[in-house]
Amino acid sequence: MATISILVAVYNAEKYLHKCLKSLLSQTLHNIEIICVNDASTDSSLSILNAYAKKDERIKVVHLSQNVGIAKARNAGLRISTGQYIAFVDSDDWLSEDACEKAFDVFTHYPLTDTVLFQVKNVYGNKDVDFIMPSFTTLDGFTAFRESLTWNIHGVYVVKRELHLRFPYDESAVAYSDENVTRLHYLNSREVRICNGIYYYRQHLGSVTHRVSLRRFDYLLANQSMKQQLEALNVSDRILDIYEEVRWRNVIGLYMFYFLHRKKLDRNSLQQGLAIIRRSWQSIEVYRLPRWLVRKFGYIPFQKSWLVFRLQEETYFFLRALLGKNKEQL
C-alpha cells in the first residue's frame, strides 16, 4: 500500500508531461504511487507514460480508448489507487520535491486532519505568483467550505482516502467537477490544515475558465449538481442558504458573460447558454437569499416573468458598461 496516491489525468500533454512526471518521481517521500490515466490522447503522451512506467514501478498507466473528460479519468485512477491519502496533479503542473512529505507530516502530527492544502504558485510563463490565502493554522470543515465558495482558499490538497472514495469527482459537471468535489471534501473534513509543500499551477489563457465558449455556462450546471448533492447529504439550512446565494450571484455573473460576449458566440450557443441561465433562474429558492440582495437592482429575481428579469439585466449591465464596471469574476 502506498502512502500517497497521485492521480494524473493526461490528455495531449506531451509538451509538459516530462516536467510533471520528473517532479513526482523526485519526491522525498518515496512510498507513493503515480496513477496516470491517458484520456485517449492523440499525441505522444501514452508513449511517454509507458516509457516512464518501465523505468519506475511506482507509475501505473491506465489507457482509456475514448476521451471521457477529466472527472471520469481521475475517477478511473481513484478506483485502482491504494494510497492512504489521495492527491491530484494536472499533467501540465508539478510539485516541489518535498510536497508529499510535507503534507504527510501534517497528517502524522495531527490525526484529526482529513485534508491538507499545498501552497500554490500560479505560473505565468516564466513568472510565479503566490496564491494568497488568509493566514490560518486549522479550519473546521464548515469554515473551509465557506471560504472555498469565493476561493479565499484554493482547492489543491491531499485528502484522506476514505473521504475521497465517499466523494469522487462529479461526473455530471464536466468542466467544473473539481470545484464540487473540493467543497464536499472540505465540508466533510474534521480539520483542514496547510503544509509548506508547493504546487506549481500552470495558467493557460485557452482554458475553459478563460475562453469565450458555451462551456462557460456549464458552471451553472455544476452549481445545480452541487446543490443536489448538498440536499442529499441533509446539510443544514444555513449551508443551503449560503450556497443558494452563491448560485444566484453566479446566475447574474453568467448573464453578464452573455451580455459582454454575445457577439463572439454563434446563435446556437447563445440560445443554449440563455436556456441554461433561464433554468437556473427558475430553480432559485428566493426565500433562501438575503433580503437586501433580492431588493438590489440587477439582482431582483422577478420570478414570475423571465422577460422582466431579462429587461432588468440588460439595463443593469448597460448602465454598468457606461460606468466601466463590467468586470468578469467567474
Q: How would you label these PLM feature ranges?
A:
Residues G141-Y219:
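Conserved nucleotide-sugar donor-binding catalytic segment
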Residues S96-P168:
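Flexible acidic/His/Gly-enriched loops in nucleotide-sugar-dependent glycosyltransferase catalytic domains
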Residues L64-S81, F88:
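Glycine-rich, basic loop-to-helix element that forms the pyrophosphate-binding segment
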Residues G197-H204, R211-R238, N250-I284:
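Catalytic core of nucleotide-sugar-dependent glycosyltransferases
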Residues N12-S26:
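Short, well-formed alpha-helical segments that are part of the catalytic scaffolds
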Residues A2-L7, L25-C36, S44, D56-K60:
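Short loop->beta transition adjacent to catalytic acidic/histidine clusters or analogous donor-positioning motifs
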Residues K263-L330:
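Membrane-interface aromatic/basic loop that binds lipid-linked glycans or pyrophosphate carriers
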Residues S23, N38-I48, Q66, D90:
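A conserved acidic beta->alpha catalytic loop
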